[in-house]
Amino acid sequence: MKDTYEVILLGAGAGIRFGAKENKILLELNQRPLYDYALSVFLNDQQCEQVVFVVQEMERLQIQHQVRNLYGSLPEKLTFVAGGSERQYSVKNGLAALNDPENGQVMVHDAARPFIDQEMVNTLLDAVKVEEAVIFAIPARDTIKVVRNQEVHQTLHRPVIWQVQTPQAFKSRLLIQAYERADQEEFVGNEEGELVERLNHPV
């Protein structure tokens, strides 16, 4: 069983929900681009074999220039690929760049989420070896209602509602299979765990 993994780092979002005029991963936090807080964790982790950084094509050169300034050169295990029109298509592009799609393990993380550390990575890596599909989530604190046509249709039972976060981790072949199924059914989901759930595989 492999003790290593690859990671797809998603940075091709437009920052619409955040309300930013530019891609939020390019914003600086303590004089570092936001994406570097996650990128540095994976680059410094010897268990990580490859970082597939999914970026907007028009921002690729800018980010590569920043990375050179941060690390002296482009790290050997860092690969850039272009993002898609939706998160799902960006992850799909990242999956196509994996070195070991058959027997490896892959994590997916949002580059705009800086609060990641080695302990989180280790926890996921240990779990995915056994469970094949694992995610981080926190209990919902707000009451969630289903609304249709401006009218409340249902109030969800808060104790069973969890807010999903990243990183997430999967056996690479399992996540690829989930994406192939989604393509066949022309289904676009919210995040990776949802696609794996559609295979009736526990997450």
Model-derived regions: residue spans:
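Conserved N-terminal catalytic core of the sugar/cofactor nucleotidyltransferase
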Residues: 36-103
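Conserved core of the sugar-phosphate nucleotidyltransferase
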Residues: 115-202
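Substrate/cofactor-recognition hotspot
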Residues: 110
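N-terminal glycine-rich phosphate-binding loop and ensuing alpha1 helix
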Residues: 2-61
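Short aromatic/hydrophobic "clamp" motif used to bind/position activated sugar donors
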Residues: 106-107
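Hydrophobic packing residues within well-ordered alpha-helices of enzyme cores
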Residues: 18, 63-67, 124
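Residues at secondary-structure transition points
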Residues: 21-24, 29, 33, 58, ...
